[in-house]
A protein has these predicted regions:
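Proteolytic maturation boundary segments
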Residues: 1-72, 131-135, 142, 162-308, ...
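M16 family metallopeptidases and their MPP-like homologs
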Residues: 24-45, 65-186, 204-212, 283-285, ...
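Flexible, low-complexity linker/tail segments at the boundary of structured domains
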Residues: 448-449
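Short Ser/Thr-interspersed hydrophobic loop/turn segments at strand-loop and sheet-helix junctions
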Residues: 539-543
Length: 568
C-alpha cells in the first residue's frame, strides 16, 4: 500500500535556508501551495483544460522574467515560473518561482522577480502575450502529432509510469492536438487572468534559499528574507505591463535574389548538389526519418584558428554575444516574440576550424529558417546593454565558480592537457576583464564577411521544388567577394607526454576523480572513426560491469574517444 503524507497549510511563510561551501550562487524558490487535484478527477477534460491554462500562465510569466536579464544592470542571474507538485509531495501542488540572486543585491533580486509576478497577478496579461503563448502551445502539439510515429520507448514508458503512479491521463498525440485546438478557441484572456489571480495566491507560502558559505559573504536573516517577499508583494507602485507592437516581417526589404548555376545528382545516396551564383555549394538529402523536420548547416573554413591568440578571452562570447544582441531590427527578446508559434531554431557558431549557421525547422517555417540564417550572416545586431548584462551575470557566476570541486578539477585537467594554452584556458575574472564587445563583433563580422567557399547541407522532409526559390533569395544573395580561406594549423593539441598529476581539495562529501588521457597517431577515415566509436562503447560496457558492478569500485566509468579529421 502506498502512503501519501499530508502537507499542512501555513498562514505565516515558512523560510528554509541551507548554506554550502560548494554552492556557487544564491538560489531562491518561492512556493505558493494549494490542494493537489484528486486522482479520480485527472481523467476528466477539465483537468487537462486547467493544465493548459496554467501552462499559458507560466509561459507568459517566464517570458517576462527572462526579460529581466536584459536590464542593465540585471537584477537577477536567472528566473522562471512553474506549476506542479510541491517539491516531492503528492498531496500538495504549488505555483513556484525559481531565481538566482545577485549576491550584492539580494533584496533587489527578490523585488524584481516577485514584483513582476505581482504585477501579473494584479493587472493580468495582455492579449498579445496570450496570443503568443497559445501559438507556442499549438505548435508544440502539432509537432508531437507530426512525430507521433517516432516516439522513443522511453517516452511511452514514462507516460505509462506517470499514469500508474499519479493517474495522469494517457493522451495520444491525436488527443492532445484535438484538445489543444479546442482550448485555443475556448479559453479567453479574462479566464486566464482570473486563473492567474487564484494561482498566484500570495498565501500558504514556502521560501527556500540555498546560498554559498564563504568568508566575506553574509546572507540576510530568515526574517529579512521573509520581509523581502512580503514587501515586494505589498508594493503599490506597479503599473500594467506594456510592450511595443511587433513588425509583420523579419526582413523589411528582401535581398536581391541570386540564381542556381547548376543542379545534378551527387554520389550514391540520393543527394542533389546545387551550385549557386555566389559559389555556395548546397547538398540536399531528402529523408523521411522525421515526418516534418528539416535540418540545415551552412559552414565555411577558418573559425577561431584565423583569430589571433590575444583575442582568446573574447572567444568565450562567440556566438553567445551575437545571439544575445539579436539580428536586424530585433533585439533577442523581440525576436523570440516574433517567432512565437513557429517551429524553427537558428544559431550561428564560430568553432576552432569552421564558422557557420545551423538550424532546424518544419516545412511550414522553412522560409523563416532561411531568413534568420541570412540575418545572422549579414546583419548581427549590436546591443551594448544586452552584452553588459551578460558580462554582469558571468562575473557574478565566476566569483564563486571554484567553490565546486568538479569545476576546479575540469579547469586543471584542461590546463594540464593543453599545456596552459591561451586558446583553451578557462574563463576567470582576470580574463573577463579583457573581454571587449566591439572586438567580438569585429571578429564575428570578419568570419562572416565573405561566403566564398561556404557549403550548405539540408537533410530532412524537404521538397526541392519549394526549396529552390528560398536558396536563390536568401543563400545565393549572401556576399561573396572571392576570399578563399582555410583553417590555420595553430590549434592546441593534447600534449604527448607521460605524466601523473595529483591534487587534493577539501570536499563536503569526499570522493576521488581519475582521468587517464591517451594520445595516438592514426589517420582519419570514416572507417577508423566508426571503429573508435565501437571501441568506446565496448570499453564503457566492460568497465562498468567490472569496476562498478562487480567490484563496486566507482560511482561510474566513462570512456571518450575522438579522431581529428583535420589533424596535420
Amino acid at each position: 500500500k502506498r502512503t501519501y503524507y499530508p502537507v499542512p497549510d501555513n498562514k505565516r511563510m515558512i523560510v528554509a535556508v541551507e548554506k554550502d561551501s560548494e554552492q556557487p550562487i544564491v538560489l531562491a524558490g518561492l512556493h505558493m501551495k494549494h490542494p493537489a487535484t484528486p486522482f479520480a478527477q485527472k481523467g476528466q477534460t477539465a483537468y487537462v483544460r486547467d493544465g493548459y491554462i496554467e501552462n499559458l500562465i507560466t509561459a507568459m510569466l517566464s517570458e517576462r522574467l527572462t526579460a529581466l536579464k536584459q536590464i542593465n544592470p540585471s537584477p537577477v542571474l536567472s528566473a522562471s515560473a512553474r506549476t506542479g507538485s510541491f517539491l516531492v509531495a503528492q498531496t500538495k501542488e504549488a505555483f513556484s518561482l525559481s531565481f538566482g540572486c545577485k549576491e550584492d543585491n539580494i533584496r533587489g533580486s527578490f523585488r524584481a522577480v516577485i514584483g513582476e509576478t505581482e504585477r501579473a497577478r494584479r493587472f493580468g496579461f495582455t492579449a498579445t502575450e496570450l496570443q503568443r503563448a497559445k501559438a507556442d502551445a499549438l505548435q508544440r502539439a502539432q509537432t508531437r502529432f507530426a512525430e507521433r510515429n517516432e516516439r522513443s520507448n522511453r517516452t511511452l514508458a514514462m507516460q505509462a509510469v506517470r499514469h500508474f503512479l499519479s493517474s495522469e491521463p494517457l493522451l495520444t498525440p491525436e488527443d492532445r492536438l484535438a484538445l489543444t485546438k479546442r482550448f485555443d478557441a475556448e479559453v479567453s484572456l479574462k479566464e486566464v487572468n482570473e486563473a492567474a489571480r487564484k494561482l498566484i495566491s500570495n498565501e500558504n507560502q514556502v521560501l527556500t534559499v540555498l546560498a554559498p558559505q564563504k568568508a566575506g559573504f553574509t546572507l540576510p536573516s530568515n526574517q529579512e528574507l521573509e520581509q523581502y517577499v512580503l514587501q515586494a508583494q505589498a508594493d503599490n507602485s506597479y503599473q500594467p505591463y506594456k510592450e511595443e507592437p511587433l513588425p509583420t516581417t523579419l526582413i523589411e526589404h528582401a535581398p536581391k535574389a541570386g540564381t542556381i548555376v547548376s543542379e545534378q545528382p551527387y554520389g550514391h545516396f540520393g543527394v542533389t548538389k546545387l551550385v549557386l551564383s555566389n559559389g555556395i555549394e548546397v547538398y540536399v538529402k531528402p529523408t523521411n526519418f522525421a515526418a516534418d523536420q528539416i535540418t540545415m548547416r551552412l559552414w565555411g573554413e577558418g573559425g577561431l584558428s584565423l583569430c589571433p591568440e590575444t583575442d582568446a578571452p573574447n572567444f568565450s562570447f562567440l556566438p553567445n554575444a551575437i545571439v544575445d544582441g539579436g539580428v536586424g531590427a530585433f533585439s533577442a527578446d523581440r525576436l523570440d516574440k516574433m517567432l512565437a508559434g513557429k517551429h524553427v531554431r537558428v544559431s550561428p557558431y564560430v568553432g576552432q576550424e569552421t564558422q557557420g549557421i545551423s538550424g532546424q525547422s518544419n516545412r511550414k517555417d522553412l522560409a523563416t529558417m532561411f531568413q534568420l540564417a541570412y540575418l545572422y550572416f549579414t546583419a548581427p545586431r549590436t546591443d551594448t546593454t544586452a552584452f553588459a548584462t551578460s558580462i554582469d551575470r558571468r562575473r557574478a557566476m565566476l566569483r564563486n565558480r571554484n567553490a565546486n570541486p568538479q569545476v576546479e578539477y575540469n579547469d586543471s585537467l584542461s590546463l594540464i592537457a593543453y599545456g596552459h594554452n591561451e586558446r583553451t584556458a578557462p574563463m576567470t575574472l582576470e580574463r573577463l576583464n579583457k573581454v571587449n564587445y566591439q572586438r567580438i563583433m569585429q571578429l564575428y563580422r570578419e568570419r562572416f564577411a565573405d561566403a566564398t567557399g561556404f557549403k550548405m547541407l539540408l537533410v530532412g522532409n524537404v521538397n526541392i521544388d519549394s526549396l529552390r526559390p528560398l536558396l536563390c533569395q536568401y543563400v545565393a544573395s549572401l556576399p561573396a567577394a572571392g576570399r578563399k580561406e582555410s583553417f590555420a594549423n595553430n590549434l592546441p593539441e593534447v600534449r604527448n607526454v607521460n605524466e601523473t598529476h595529483v591534487f587534493t581539495k577539501k570536499m563536503n562529501t569526499p570522493s576521488a576523480l581519475v582521468t587517464i588521457i591517451y594520445t595516438f597517431d592514426l589517420p582519419y577515415t570514416p572507417k577508423s572513426n566508426l571503429a573508435l566509436d565501437a571501441l568506446r562503447r565496448v570499453l564503457t560496457i566492460a568497465f562498468t560491469d567490472s569496476i562498478r558492478e562487480e567490484k563496486g569500485g566507482a560511482y561510474g566509468v566513462g570512456v571518450q574517444g575522438e579522431l581529428d579529421c583535420n589533424s596535420r
